[in-house]
Regions:
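Phosphate- and other anionic-substrate recognition elements at nucleic-acid/protein interfaces
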Residues: 1-72
Length: 72
């Protein structure tokens, strides 16, 4: 399982991908839009789950990512 932390801003999303041992596999920034999220999700190691702080900018991201996440 891979664990992804998101730091969501109005125009960008910073991310960090770690494995179960805590080793960082990837860090970066993508644009905060559906097209970039779709591209980014295709590049992620499987399976994965995500965590992010709930802010005014995160509602649509949660809704967009939810169908792609593996249930616990």
């Amino acid at each position: 399982m891979y664990y992804i932390g998101l730091d969501v801003h109005k125009k960008t999303i910073s991310y960090c991908v770690k494995d179960a041992s805590g080793q960082v596999h990837r860090e970066g920034t993508i644009g905060a839009n559906r097209n970039e999220l779709d591209w980014w999700m295709k590049t992620l190691p499987q399976p994965w789950t995500v965590a992010m702080e709930a802010t005014i900018f995160t509602g649509w991201i949660y809704d967009h990512l939810l169908p792609h996440m593996r249930p616990r």
